[in-house]
Amino acid sequence: DADPRGELDLSDAVVVLDEVCRTCDADWTRSLMQRAGRVVCRNLGQVVIARELGVTFDVAAPVFCANRATLTWLRGLGAGRVYLPAELLGNDAERIAELAAEPGVWGPVDADRPELMVCEHCLLTAEGVCATDATGQVRCRDCLRRRQVRYLVERDGTRLPVAIDACGRTRIFLS
């Protein structure tokens, strides 16, 4: 949520980048990559930027690594660590054992709260008009609705937690 011009020292940090990287996010992403000790790329566009900048990077879902061929390809691109996707951990013990035997293969980035989906658009627009500033510009970071606890209720009554970030991206979680 901070301004990229704040230039915090992140040299000792591992920065896990967002799954979505819009064109308008490129400068912010580059700034984070240049200041971070290491970054975790969550899409191939970020991998391209990391390679251009020559920074140390890892790869995690939604970039899906489910076999040795993909692992070899990601390593060939320069990935130091590869995080296995949470979906794989629940389904295929044999494949996990094979991949986990390789150096630099880790479990999922966030196994405690697995995401079902990331939507590039804000689902709160279904409730009404977005928050705007004095000039009429939409300001997601100032939206009071996004700070409230929200759930998507499925037909069977299952309540899926929903979070909206400061850029208006919606995340729906499994639990």
Name each model feature, range by range.
Residues 1-175:
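Active-site pocket-lining/capping segments in soluble small-molecule metabolic enzymes
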